[in-house]
Amino acid sequence: MGKAGGNKKKSTGTPRRVSWLGVLLLLMTGIVPLGLVGTFLCVYIPPGRFGITTLLGLAFPWLVLASAALGIAYLFFFKKRCLIFFAAILLNFHNLGLSVRLPHNDRPRRDDHRMASATRPSEFKVLSYNVCLFGYYAQDDRNGRKDRIASYIGVEEADILCLQEYYESKAPQFRIRETLRKAGYRHHTRLLENARFYFGNAIFSRFPILRQDTVPGLSPLNALYADLQLPGGDTLRVYTFHLASLRFDDHDKALYHELLNKPLDESVSYKAEAGKIARKVSRAARIHAEQVRQIKAHAAACPYRVLICGDMNENPVSYAYHTLAKGLKDAFTERGVGLGRTYSGFFPAYRIDYIFHRAALDPATGKVSDGMDARLATRHFEVGAVDYSDHRPISAVINY
């Protein structure tokens, strides 16, 4: 009897470990698919209603990876349950297509635009680039960054430049416009200025500018447009935009890296600090939603071909992207490859810079006809592999 009682008290601890693993898997089985349902819905829900939808959009790549990993794991143990994870991914098939693109067999060479310009005159190349003030505040490498960015622009030989966070000192050693004029950009939009420098968004073009203005209701620091005269006489309206910054300070950046590296450090109030970052993200998303509505409404009334380029500060799985992209073609989804990541600085390290376009409206219907829409198509898209700014440049060759 003594031995039997003693045997009852023995425990190897293995069942407890299995139990904790089971609880973790059970939680993940519920959280991950629900998170992906949330990412599917977040592009339709204005961020002012539920702030968490913005955060779910940012978590989308990690939720997909977690769902795929759990689906494969369950495939070996609980085959029916694995369908939950794959169904959640399938629900987000469109969002997945916005986030990653497979290579094309007929992808043209990056230098093909200039080589074929004589035989294919009905196309233009656009370069959109947040130049981060041309590195003006990089005190140890100010002129070096400016010169490298200007050199990159010259090598790309785009017909249209959409530059965000443009900066040009009135001091003689920092004259950007003169450099760009020598590269063939004889036309540009008006720049904001004070006593010492020019700044803001800017459109530079090899084509004549017929008209330029700001988008009603928005600051020229957020968006402006210009009507360009293409070869042959057609008009192209070009918008460039820079939506509100997330306004992360050095403390936020340090906390973010600490959260990644020391998630269990009790010396920091993570809940309060992480909540501060989440509130900044949600606040910016609400501002972005209103800004894109105004850009969208203005562009929708334009009868000409439309090109919209800029820094959205939002990833593709967001309400702002979905609102602006509806009815437009995204050059990346037409001809891009890979993840298309454009932000190389602090969070969010996703695709947040875009080139959209649409054909001219049919005068009879006020809508884009199928024939006109088919003619305006992206032939080539590329994310520049340079780190001269905290953003990478993006370019597209578009047939019209």
What is each of the regions a protein language model found here?
Residues M1-S19:
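N-terminal Lys/Arg-rich, disordered targeting/topogenic segments
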Residues L21-L36, L41-F76, L83-F86, H94-N95, ...:
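Metal-dependent phosphoester-hydrolase catalytic domains
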Residues T39, W62, R81-C82, I89-E123, ...:
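Structured beta-strand-rich core segments of catalytic domains in phosphoester-bond hydrolases
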Residues E123, S128-K146, E168, R247-A284:
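Acidic/histidine-rich helix-loop elements
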Residues K125-V131, R145-Q173, A226, R237-H242, ...:
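Active-site beta-strand/loop signature of hydrolases that rely on acidic residues for catalysis
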Residues Y129, A183-T189, G327-E334:
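Short hydrophobic/aromatic-enriched beta-strand-loop microsegments
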Residues Y137-N143, V215-G217, S344-F346:
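Short, solvent-exposed loop/turn segments at secondary-structure boundaries
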